Each structure stands twice: as structure tokens, then as C-alpha cells.
Amino acid sequence: MGRIIGIDLGTTNSCVAVLDGDKARVIENAEGDRTTPSIIAYTADETLVGQPAKRQAVTNPTNTVFAIKRLIGRRFKDDEVQRDVDIMPFKIIGADNGDAWVEAQGKKMAPPQISAEILKKMKKTAEDYLGEEVTEAVITVPAYFNDSQRQATKDAGRIAGLEVKRIINEPTAAALAYGIDKKQGDNIVAVYDLGGGTFDISIIEIDSVDGEQTFEVLATNGDTHLGGEDFDNRLINYLADEFKKEQSLDLRNDPLAMQRLKEAAEKAKIELSSTTQTEVNLPYITADATGPKHLVVKITRAKLESLVEDLITRSLEPLKVALADADLSVSDINEVILVGGQTRMPKVREEVSSFFGKELRQDVNPDEAVAIGAAVQAGVLSGDVKDVLLLDVTPLSLGIETMGSVMTKLIEKNTTIPTKASQTFSTADDNQAAVTIHVLQGERKQSSGNKSLGQFNLEGIEPAPRGMPQIEVAFDIDADGILHVSATDKKTGKAQNITIKASSGLSDEEVEAMVRDAEAHADEDAKFEELVTARNQADGMVHATKKQIEEAGEELPADEKEKIEAAMANVDTATKGSDKEAIEKATQELMEASSKLMEIAQAKAQAQQGQPEGAGEAQQDAHAADDVVDAEFEEVKDDKK
């Protein structure tokens, strides 16, 4: 069986880890970074992911997609999505099924399809490190993700060519990373997770009895549309307003300027975590009839804190709810762990520390803890990590719509999963032949105030007065937090079973089509890599041949030199094209044409072997030259990758 990797699929950055012996290890990507920006760019002929996508964002803002996690599993008409429609430089559209999709380079794409590009990058990063194919993963999601968002994340994994062995909640993963090597007794930990686009709070009890550790989630709460992106947007709007006051020009109408502003705001926010003042200086940000305009604004830490004060306060409300749900007070919490890049902001740390009345743990890396925890869970699933039991919960209540548009709950929020529950219902009318089971998720009594997860019909009910037929509805939540529902007519035994896919969401056929599309692109990528390798080998051969011609000097006959130069010209022409076979053929012909050069080089080497003193000097030079050629060839090859 291959290795199972752990992936933190983040809003702003993503991270991949694997169990290395008994320790989880974060894997560096091809650029040498431990985290990868969750940014995807679509150009006319390729898809860029991570740093390469981020670097070109300023010149290609409408086709560069970021924070796609904020859209995954969401409806286009959702208030949160509509807010993003107004501020994102890329185009967010409504799909035929009502989902929020993205349009780039004239192509309409579902969020799972775009997220799959990030997962493919994580998969490749792990494969390069392990030296073997990776087909299985544990992927993390915000604890407060609903069923649609979890299902969409699993779809993204499938499209990326990964079997998602488990969906695990981010705060739970962070607690695993923190607690796996701490074998003390009972410990109640609060995990405050403020990432790029989502916020979660989980209260987790870590028990260690007779060498077995139990991680039990007591309560969870959060906001799936609150994170670092919102903090950035406050600063972006402030800078745009300041510029408008000074220049009477609104940068919000200029996508290129807004992309530069976004990068500058993000950089300024990070700088203000370690300094009390910074300056945003963007020359030539835009221009009008009077000439170019420059943006220069000084920002203090106090100013930034005033801009985001309500966002920080907003994150404290779920803490109170989670504590109440767990039936605990602040004094019952032993440790507080901060996860997510936005928790590096001093004001956030100060407010959380003040809320819990205790010092925060400093030994957890907020960017890597979640991926490490996912790798630990992967180890549990593969049997490499023993004596660890993880008991997670469902974040929201689940039920069905009953008479009077009331939501009747079958499973309460914060119930440990996996779990099952069933309840018997009846018909509302005489001789009713079918019932519609409308599945809901949320805490409101009125059905319309909750998230609709989908509906299905149970037909063929025998005619009977209202209230007589007995229909058993059973809910079954698996370890991923995904819901399976069945309805059975107790008299006839007729049953209808479904795995809940949101009333929106992607069908199996759509996911399969996207998988095939991804596989087709994988073939294209492999062919492109082979082409680059052939070009690099050809360039290396030409470079080495030119050096040998110089070294041969007058010993190389003019007609041979002419033949070799013609072969080199053919190689140059071939490498400008995209025909791998033509490049390889031209390279082979150059090798054959250079046979005279090889003879001269061998004769020189034999002559040098006869020298008793200083024989090594010329030979060393030749070897040094060879080494230079090899090293340069390897470097070019790596660079192209």
C-alpha cells in the first residue's frame, strides 16, 4: 500500500506533510517553500499554481484565482458570495445548478475543479519527495464547514487523482499535532483557528490513559467567511479611499491597480506584526490626463487595529458559544493554541489571551500544525500510528422539514461522529402515496433559515388515513462528517437511500468529466516535461561540442568542422520547435557528426597519459570542462521543471 499524505487545503496557503518514521514532516515544494500560495492562474496555454501564479497576478488579475475555498460548496445567491463578487478581480458567476463558479479565459469552472489544481501541486510535491506515486490523502477542512462544503472538498480530491481517506477538521488536526508527543493526563485545549478565509474554535479534551491517547472534540463553532482576506480587504479599501481623497481617482475601477494594492496591503499587514509603522509606496499606480499618479501612505499598527477591530470582536462570539455548548467556563481551559496565519497579528493574540485569561502556547507553528495533524491522522488510518483515538463532532444540527415548515432535528450539533439516528414520521394527508424527505442543516426552527442539503421522494406508500403509515427516517454520519439518509415504509419495507449531495453540488458524471479532463492535462504536462528534457539535452550537447571545437583548434579538418556546424544549426532549429522526436534526431545526428572530435579528444588524452610530470593538469582542465557542462545541463533541467 502506498503512503497516505496529509494536506492542509488553505484559503491563502496550502501545505502537505507525511509521516516520516514516527514524526510528521512538512514537505518543501519545488520552489523550496514549506507552504504554497493557494493561487491558480490561467493563461492562454498553461495553468500556473502557487508562487508562479502569484508572481504574474498583477499583469493577469482577471484570470488569477485566489481564496477559492470561500466559494467551495456555496450558492451564487449567498450573501457572502455576493460580497466577494463585488471585490474579487476575477469573475464569479452563477452556474446552471445555482452554485458559485468562476470564469477565467472564457471557461466556466466549478470551485472543486480549481481547488483540484492546488491538490495536484501538493500531490506532486509529496511524490517528488517520496519517490513514489501517491494516490491517498487526508484533507483538512474548517470545522464549521457544512455538508455541501465537505462533499465539494472530497470532489476536489477525486478530480486531483486522490482517494480522500478522511476529511478531518482543521482545529482537530492542530490539536493532534500539538498533543501527539505529550503524554500527560487530562488536558482541555482550545484551538483558535483564524486562517485566510475561515474561522473556527474547537474545545478538545486530550486524555492519556495506559499509553492510549484520546482526542475528543467537546464543541466546535465558527464562521466560514471570516479570515485574513477580510483583514486585507479593510486595508485595501482604506488605501483606495486615501488615494481617492488625494487624487480624486477611484482605483477600484482599475483591476491592475487593485492587484498591486492587494499585494501591498498584504505585505503591510505582515510588516505591522513586527513593527509599529510602515509605508505603502506604489509609484505609477495609475494615470490621468495630467500624467502618472503615485500612492504613498503611512500606516501605523494602531490604524490597522482600528480598521479590523470589529472583525476580531466577531471572532470572540463563537468562543462563548463553544464554551457554553461544552458546558465549560474559561477557567476549565488548560491550554490555548493559535492556528492560521492571521493569528500572528499582535492584536488578535492580545484579545484571545485576554478572553481566556492565560498565556498562549508558543510551540505550535500556525502555518504547519494543521498539515502535520493531517499526516498524523493519515498514520492512524494506515496503522503506522497506534494508540490514538480521534473523536470528532458534527458542527451543525441535522434534521428534516416537517409540517408547518418546521425543522425537526434528528442529530444535534456537537454530536460525536460517526453516529446514527432515526425517527418515525407519518403522512400529512389521507391516501398520500409519496412523501418528500427534505434534509436540512442548521440551528433555526424555521426550515427556510437552515441550509438545504437536498431532498428525495419515498413513493409507493399504500393508501391509508393521514397519520397511519409509519415512515422511518434514518441519518448516518460517517467519519468524514458526510451524511447518508434513508427512508423506509415500515409496512411495505420499501426504502429509498441517498448519500446527501447538496441540492447544488456536482453530479458524479460532472466529477468524472473533470477527472478525465485533469488526466488529459496530466498527459500534456508529462509530454511538455519530456520536450523540455530533450531541449536541455540538445542545448547541453551543442555547448559541449562548441568547447571541443575550440580545444581541437587546427587539428579539426575544415570539412569536418563545417559538417559539425551544420549539425549544430539543425539542432538550434529543432529546439525552437515543439517536436520532441525532431530534437532527439537532430541531437543524435550531431553526436554522429562529432565523431572526429571524439577521436581528437581521445588522442590528446592518450598523449597526456604518457607524460610523467604534471600529466594531470591538462587532463584536470578537460575534466573540469566536462563537469561544467554536466552541471550546467542539470541546472537548466531543474530550472525548466
From Swiss-Prot:
Residues 601-641 are annotated as: Disordered. The modification Phosphothreonine is found at residue 198. It holds the Pfam family HSP70. The keyword Manganese does not apply. SUPFAM superfamilies: Actin-like ATPase domain, Heat shock protein 70kD (HSP70), peptide-binding domain. Residues 627-641 have a biased composition (Acidic residues). InterPro entries: ATPase_NBD (IPR043129), Chaperone_DnaK (IPR012725), Heat_shock_70_CS (IPR018181), HSP70_C_sf (IPR029048), HSP70_peptide-bd_sf (IPR029047), Hsp_70_fam (IPR013126). Belongs to the heat shock protein 70 family. NCBIfam families: PRK00290.1, prok_dnaK. This is Chaperone protein DnaK. The gene is dnaK.
